[in-house]
Amino acid sequence: MRVRPAAVAGFTLIEVMIAVAIVAILAAVALPAYQDYVRRGNIPEATAALGQGRIAMEQWFQDNRTYEGAACPGNGQHFGLACATTATTFTITATGAGSMAGFSYTIDQNNGRTSSTPWGNGATCWIARKGDAC
């Protein structure tokens, strides 16, 4: 009596290569979208800090009748803040660092907002996502 050999179970090399190729294609599409999503998620850190900084500057002006000497808000995790003040004007700039390099947002005493991002520049607004315009 002949014994039949047991069937070999498992994947062939071709099947594994096709699965790897499919995963690579999906990763190539998903990674840039994810990176864009993460960048957009970091932008509110800058805009919130600028808004809070503007309020602090206005409170200082109400107490002292000058913007000079007002404290600049502290740096965040992804943005560094810098202030320029005169007796009657101020500008607060949030400049991106690390993964947010290339992003810059400003606000002034008139609530004038500008932005410079890899996605485009906003002369009168803050650009928060790719394709936005003022």
Residue ranges and their predicted role:
Residues 8, 40-44, 48, 85, ...:
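Residues at secondary-structure transition points
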Residues 38-66:
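Membrane-proximal N-terminal amphipathic helix
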Residues 6-34:
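N-terminal single-pass transmembrane signal-anchor helix
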Residues 55-134:
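Periplasmic/extracellular, small/polar-rich flexible segments of pilin-like filament-forming proteins
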Residues 2-4:
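Bacterial Sec-dependent N-terminal signal peptides
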